[in-house]
Amino acid sequence: PIVISENSKKLKAYYNQPSIEYKNVTGYISFIQPSIKFMNIIDGNSVNNIALIGKDKQHYHTGVHRNLNIFYVNEDKRFEGAKYSIGGITSANDKAVDLIAEARVIKEDHTGEYDYDFFPFKIDKEAMSLKEIDFKLRKYLIDNYGLYGEMSTGKITVKKKYYGKYTFELDKKLQEDRMFDVINVTDIDRIEIKVIKA
């Protein structure tokens, strides 16, 4: 039988939880303490909190910010008992977007590569946060490729058209300071994924 590590169990629990996509919403800035800043999104009768760290902290000053898209995922930890998300903030679309990026999945075990496959990755925003891309791809890999079960680790590479790439190591959660990074979707050339057998 496959022995699933504690790390894989933790990652699976995080990436398998529900996410919420807010489109064209307004965020309100609140300072909890001088060094701690949150954006609040009002959703019906509840308020969802987004911790602003890194670039987001500088970018979103006091007051009200309109026309935002937000990809919201609860973090494992809480702040003063309240759940919160980190990053995932982009500007709302100026125009409708309906793109497909091709994702290639290579399966590997101790002898090397043994299988590959393709799937379409749907894009409906002009800009996407790395948080959203990382979360959606890992969720798909959990549901369809046994990630954090039979396949324990690997790497996602999002290649850009002209130069550069973004890499996500599948044996660790996306770093908090990358959750607010944003990519223009027209820059995405292709997505390459390697999943490695436990």
What do the PLM-derived regions correspond to, one by one?
Residues 170-198:
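Proteolytic cleavage junctions
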Residues 24-62, 92-165:
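Mature extracytoplasmic domains of secretory-pathway proteins
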Residues 1-14:
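Sec-dependent signal peptide cleavage junction
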Residues 53-96:
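Long, charge-rich, low-complexity intrinsically disordered regions
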